[in-house]
Amino acid sequence: MDTVHSAVGSSKTLLTFFFTREKLFLAFLMNRNTEGSVRLVLDRLEKRFGTFDFLTLFEYILTDRGAEFGDPDSLETGVTGIQRTNIYYCDPMRSGQKGGIEQAHTMLRMILPKRTTFEFLTQWDVNLITSHINSTPRESLNGRTPYDVALEAFGEDVLKAFQLRRIDPDKVILTPKLIRYNPVSYTHLTLPT
């Protein structure tokens, strides 16, 4: 679990997850980069899947020591008051311990380059972005896509609940053109260097 920040001046942030075996990448738009916002995403996912299925999917979560992840007890405790996950922290200055998510962030930044504000994004846009990223074949999966591997591992209902869909690999777009901008707000998407 990690966060990807918007341009300076924007409070919106993406909370991201990476399933290491399947290489499946998820992202959820948050209005602020706070522990409360992270908990809200986890609560919504737990309600969507139910506590047992949430625990099955998110049994262990590895993250960094960002302030938004600073109270593991709060994040580990579910909406029913029972423990829903186990939070573990990377060692300081060891981003390689969660290298898979960093590689997924690199793909995300191909679509949403640094200095891009997320103020214009909707969760629908984020789901489209993650669907394209997860439909990109990976060498580490013997040329298969994370979507297809996750479909076998988790089933179609889980991928639908994550609001992911399969994109034909020939139609995958990993550029800013993927998100169609409103021309009126286009000038507000990036900040000058």
Regions found by a protein language model. Give the residues of each.
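Active-site beta-loop-alpha junctions of metal-dependent nucleic acid enzymes
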Residues: 6-10, 27-52
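Conserved small/polar residues in nucleotide/adenosyl-binding loops
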Residues: 186-193
